[in-house]
Amino acid sequence: MDILLQQIINGLVLGSMYALIALGYTMVYGIIQLINFAHGEVLMIGALTSWSCIGLMQEAMPGAPGWSILLLATLIACVVAAALNFTIEKVAYKPLRNSPRLAPLITAIGMSILLQTLAMIVWKPNYKPYPTLLPAAPFQIGGAVITTTQILILGVTVVALASMVYLVSYTRLGRAMRATAENPRVAALMGVKPDMVISATFIIGAVLAAIAGIMWASNYGTAQHTMGFLPGLKAFTAAVFGGIGNLAGAVVGGILLGLIEAIGSGYIGQLTGGVLGSHYTDIFAFIVLIIILTLRPSGLLGERVADRA
C-alpha cells in the first residue's frame, strides 16, 4: 500500500508537469490547428537558461535565499522562452499559415532539431546538475514522501489551469482567442487582430513550457539539451488523450498519463515476471496514445468536429 501511495504521488507530480506542457500544445492547436513539435525544446531552453542564471546569481549574490534566486531565474527564463517562441512563430510558422498542413508540421520538427543543436553548441552536450534551491527535507504522507519541489509543482499546475480558464473565459484577450479559433477572417472583420492573438498564444505557451522545464529540472536534478524531447512528446500524448484544443482536457490527460506511467513503473516488474524493468515505462504513454487514437480520436473531453480545410 505504501508503494502504491508513493507511486500515486509521483504520478500526480509527473502528470502535473505533463499538464503544464500540454496546455501550451492545446492552446496553439486550438487557435491555428498547428502541432508545435518545437514546444518541448522551448521547455529545454527555459530550463537551461534558468540553470545559467542560477549559477551567475549564486556567484554574484552568495547570501541570497534560494527561493529568491529560483524566482528571479524563472522570470528571466520565461522572458527568454517567450521571445524565442514569438520569433519562431513569426519566422517559421506565420509564412506557412495558408500552406498544406504537412508544411508547418515538417517545419516544427525541423525547428525542434535546430533548437536542440543550438542548445548543444551553447550549453555543451553534457548533463548539468540542477541546484536544489528549496528546502530538501521531505514531508511524510502515510508511508510515502513528498518534497517541497513536488508540492510546488502541484500548486503551480492548479494556478496555471485556473489562470488559463480565467484568461480564455473572462478577458478581452480570451474572447479574441475564441473568435480567432472559430474563424480568423470573421474575427478580423469584428476588430480582432489575429496576428496579435496568435503571437500572444505562443508567448503564453512558452511561459508555461519554461516553468514546466524549470520544475522538471528541479524535480530530477539535471538539465541537458535533449531533455525536452521526450516530455514534449508525452505531453502531446496527454493533450490528445484529454482532447487537444480543450484546456481541461490537457490537464486531465496529463494527470492520467502521469498516474498510468508512475503506477506502471512501480509494478511493471511484477506484471511481466521480471522481464521488464522500470526503465521500460515510456511504453505506457504510447500504448495509451494508440488506444485513444483507435477508440476515441477526439480524446476524453474533446468534441468530434469536422476537419478544417
Q: Residue locations for each model-derived region?
A:
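Membrane-interfacial amphipathic/re-entrant helices at transmembrane-helix boundaries
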Residues: 1-21, 49, 60-72, 99-103, ...
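Membrane-embedded helix boundary and interhelical linker motif in transport proteins
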Residues: 31-87, 91, 267-275
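Transmembrane helix-bundle core of multi-pass membrane transporters
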Residues: 95-96, 101-170, 197, 263-282, ...
